[in-house]
Swiss-Prot record:
<feature type="topological domain" description="Extracellular">
    <location>
        <begin position="359"/>
        <end position="368"/>
    </location>
</feature>
<feature type="transmembrane region" description="Helical">
    <location>
        <begin position="165"/>
        <end position="187"/>
    </location>
</feature>
<feature type="transmembrane region" description="Helical">
    <location>
        <begin position="457"/>
        <end position="477"/>
    </location>
</feature>
<dbReference type="GO" id="GO:0016323">
    <property type="term" value="C:basolateral plasma membrane"/>
</dbReference>
<dbReference type="GO" id="GO:0042910">
    <property type="term" value="F:xenobiotic transmembrane transporter activity"/>
</dbReference>
<feature type="glycosylation site" description="N-linked (GlcNAc...) asparagine">
    <location>
        <position position="56"/>
    </location>
</feature>
<dbReference type="GO" id="GO:0015132">
    <property type="term" value="F:prostaglandin transmembrane transporter activity"/>
</dbReference>
<dbReference type="GO" id="GO:0015732">
    <property type="term" value="P:prostaglandin transport"/>
</dbReference>
<keyword id="KW-1133">Transmembrane helix</keyword>
<feature type="region of interest" description="Disordered">
    <location>
        <begin position="513"/>
        <end position="550"/>
    </location>
</feature>
<feature type="topological domain" description="Extracellular">
    <location>
        <begin position="246"/>
        <end position="248"/>
    </location>
</feature>
<feature type="topological domain" description="Extracellular">
    <location>
        <begin position="478"/>
        <end position="484"/>
    </location>
</feature>
<feature type="transmembrane region" description="Helical">
    <location>
        <begin position="10"/>
        <end position="30"/>
    </location>
</feature>
<feature type="glycosylation site" description="N-linked (GlcNAc...) asparagine">
    <location>
        <position position="92"/>
    </location>
</feature>
<dbReference type="GO" id="GO:0097254">
    <property type="term" value="P:renal tubular secretion"/>
</dbReference>
<feature type="transmembrane region" description="Helical">
    <location>
        <begin position="249"/>
        <end position="269"/>
    </location>
</feature>
<dbReference type="InterPro" id="IPR004749">
    <property type="entry name" value="Orgcat_transp/SVOP"/>
</dbReference>
Amino acid sequence: MAFNDLLQQVGGVGRFQQIQVTLVVLPLLLMASHNTVQNFTAAIPTHHCRPPANANLSKDGGLEAWLPRDRQGQPESCLRFTSPQWGPPFPNGTEANGTGATEPCTDGWIYDNSTFPSTIVTEWDLVCSHRALRQLAQSLYMVGVLLGAMVFGYLADRLGRRKVLILNYLQTAVSGTCAAFAPNFPIYCAFRLLSGMSLAGIALNCMTLNVEWMPIHTRACVGTLIGYVYSLGQFLLAGVAYAVPHWRHLQLLISVPFFAFFIYSWFFIESARWHSSSGRLDLTLRALQRVARINGKREEGAKLSMEVLRASLQKELTMGKGQASAMELLRCPTLRHLFLCLSMLWFATSFAYYGLVMDLQGFGVSIYLIQVIFGAVDLPAKLVGFLVINSLGRRPAQMAALLLAGICILLNGVVPQDQSVIRTSLAVLGKGCLAASFNCIFLYTGELYPTMIRQTGLGMGSTMARVGSIVSPLVSMTTELYPSVPLFIYGAVPVAASAVTVLLPETLGQPLPDTVQDLESRKGKQTPQQQEHQKYMVPLQASAQEKNGL
């Protein structure tokens, strides 16, 4: 009897699965908020230099006398006159406004608080020479996500999914709350890094715990549900950020609910599959019988015994012996080729994705509106992506998604700043293509790697995505050279990566490889068993989507 048969015996998709899946998925609403909350908590309002403390504005001719103008006729953000400049304003940077000696803002800045009453930028003056620190905060958060994926992924295999989830909920609640009360910028960054670590663990173990309690034929549906819940979280963030504009209050609001998640997570039932893989048949039996009672299948649960479990576990133990290490990806030429090509695709997708979603202020429209639009475009993008990869194939879908995304971003770099409608439309289209690229790369990676190293390959791909999300905020610092430089870089990387897809084989309609030998000889028709395996198992890999990237 296979493990899937055991799940069917204790109720399949019963009351227990419905309750636990709902409770495990619920925190993902706020996970999306944590990933991109810095668009609001680190927003940069309009600002200009504060006059000297001893300045007499009424005598000097008002604040305008201290502010030089830029080429657009707006007050300079990072310079002031060393002495007041009398006379009419000179919006074109001529005469007094163009010849007066200037100096940095040694007395601080005055911010326009009409949209954002308080952000980490205004509180700690992360502008001008300190502007790079704003992006550093987001990069450190992504470093935490990278570390969390490695640390908590390992701990979940050692300690169990439930225990690690409980720890992650508590860590997110505590670190997120502490970040809201951080007295200075370094401490804020430290707590954000810890939040990134724990949220990566939540994303990883949420998916694992849910699918390990679901029958095969429902796992793709659960994965799709998880993806759409994450997208819904992007809508939620826009509304919450609009209602709560103060950065400390917003940070607190998206963190405190994790205390509730921590409390109810104690009632989760540990994965019986994990118990069995750890050799704890007694705990496996106890968990299955408990689920049977909740699902109203008490009599079926009573029929289970240690002997039945041993028979079911035998195949899993045999498959477990065939697992390969990550080093196998580099030792074997065929796997090394896949690893290098797929790493480029993972990196490019995540790099460009976070380059777009973490620069909402750069499109010249309401930051709240574009947050909603960016969340909404995921819905049709995921649907269109699903249809394309199942009709035209994985390789052309992956190539088209990256190529179109890159072209849209590159075009955005040459569109004038005042054309906000065109720039926003291109950004939304590019973001939708990158969402489709995330869908495709999860699926494509799962189909390319053989069973013996499939999970390891997916894990390494996810790691490269984390690297892309870490580097992406740092690239935005190149705006100091020229405003469109980041967009040219964000666009060029996916365009270049799209060419890599021609080096990969097509997997549409092909049986899943179990060994490297299968990979090297992808020929022959699929057996009915292989067709079922591909139909239900592969979409599971795709369902993680960009939330793990995130």
